[in-house]
Amino acid sequence: MVATCNNGEILHVLFLPFLSAGHFIPLVNAARLFASRGVKATILTTPHNALLFRSTIDDDVRISGFPISIVTIKFPSAEVGLPEGIESFNSATSPEMPHKIFYALSLLQKPMEDKIRELRPDCIFSDMYFPWTVDIADELHIPRILYNLSAYMCYSIMHNLKVYRPHKQPNLDESQSFVVPGLPDEIKFKLSQLTDDLRKSDDQKTVFDELLEQVEDSEERSYGIVHDTFYELEPAYVDYYQKLKKPKCWHFGPLSHFASKIRSKELISEHNNNEIVIDWLNAQKPKSVLYVSFGSMARFPESQLNEIAQALDASNVPFIFVLRPNEETASWLPVGNLEDKTKKGLYIKGWVPQLTIMEHSATGGFMTHCGTNSVLEAITFGVPMITWPLYADQFYNEKVVEVRGLGIKIGIDVWNEGIEITGPVIESAKIREAIERLMISNGSEEIINIRDRVMAMSKMAQNATNEGGSSWNNLTALIQHIKNYNLN
């Protein structure tokens, strides 16, 4: 089935993903979903980012016949002083590189604008961190759809913090809890858990803070906003947020699960560790394995990694601990443990097939940094969580898990400004206590209830993406809105 405009031409949507795996994976999956509905989908990115998912897109064309393609723009490596191949925040190998990548983004704006003018799409589906796309959409008289990574609850929290400013009350101590006013639930925070932009005065604003202000302005000027969530996870917040925002809002998540129904579960298919991980999981008992991953960007000090390793070892719980590709392990990792499947646990460097791990019957828990994708993937496959938020919006994402009763907390109170984790080191005893509480206390009423709730939510997530489900219908409605825009 082909989606056409009023002039008989196939509806053409251009997708512009941000240069970070946590952002580009769901947005590329959104492009695949549109293509599966007969929409011509063009993904605009840089060469080395395209390599990560090109084989999946090629198979979508070759096997499924989808009208989807990738167009690349040269990344300005030499101009910003980066080695060839470093084109995303995940590939950065030093603290200085993210700043250079941000600079590169500003240099990419003009060539991207020129390419969009050349391609003449009927709609731009843009990551939130490309606020300038609202201007090019206005110039071309086409709708701009903004992709927001987080759940409605998270954005409702952020909105109400900015409006009501409960964290600005006099004499509020860093360790004191306060309630965020006006929300459907009583949600509490400590000042130390808030993102830096909320705690700074206006004269302390950084370049990134200014970008966030541009993002907020572009939201108001966009035709609509898409969230990677599903109605049944947060019905009160879907309704609440949609009343707050002027642009229309849609949600057709979980995108990872929705897209897996097309053909391939994993977007990034080239995992060197696939066979090691799957063979090892196949040898474990059902629900016995703790999966530990803090994303591909966070940089823990060796002292913290050592505490985590000690806790995992002492708990006697089988585990998979995923480390960054260039993580230095010599000083803290027990000798012989790296990728040694004869051990009770696996330490794996680099990318792993996370969706496959989540779906495996041996996986019984997930220690997570509360990245948006990770939380949603755990919910989708019914895996209860141990939450350990670090930076960005992760303390807000933790509230989704807390309010819905889908896991337990390590108890982190300090937000980090960047990917270099400098907060207080959490001792192994505290980490071990959380691991054993979730993984060994399976007979306790608390853990039984958590597992029941997350399994029920998993069924709702999967039903939402079935034909006639809430997310399926939202995707259908969005495509129709874009068609109607082009009729006017």
Curated annotation (Swiss-Prot):
Protein induction: Induced by wounding.
InterPro entries associated with the record: UDP_glucos_trans (IPR002213), UDP_glycos_trans_CS (IPR035595)
Residue numbers binding an anthocyanidin: H23, A392
CDD domains listed in its UniProt record: GT1_Gtf-like
Binding site for UDP-alpha-D-glucose: V352, Q354, H369, N373, S374, E377, D393, Q394
Catalysed transformations (reactions): solasodine + UDP-alpha-D-glucose = solasodine 3-beta-D-glucoside + UDP + H(+); solanidine + UDP-alpha-D-glucose = solanidine 3-O-beta-D-glucopyranoside + UDP + H(+); tomatidine + UDP-alpha-D-glucose = tomatidine 3-O-beta-D-glucopyranoside + UDP + H(+)
Enzyme class: transferase
BP terms from Gene Ontology: steroid metabolic process
Residues of the signal peptide: none
Keywords: Glycosyltransferase, Transferase
Tissue: Expressed in the shoot apical meristem (SAM) and tuber.
Keyword match Transmembrane helix: no
EC number(s) per entry: 2.4.1.-
GO MF annotations in UniProt: UDP-glucosyltransferase activity
Keyword Glycosyltransferase attributed: yes
Active site: H23, D127
Role played: Glucosyltransferase involved in the glucosylation of the steroidal alkaloid aglycons solanidine, solasodine and tomatidine to produce their corresponding glycoalkaloids.
Entry's family note: Belongs to the UDP-glycosyltransferase family.
Record-given protein name: Solanidine UDP-glucose glucosyltransferase 1
Organism: Solanum tuberosum
Gene name in the database record: SGT1
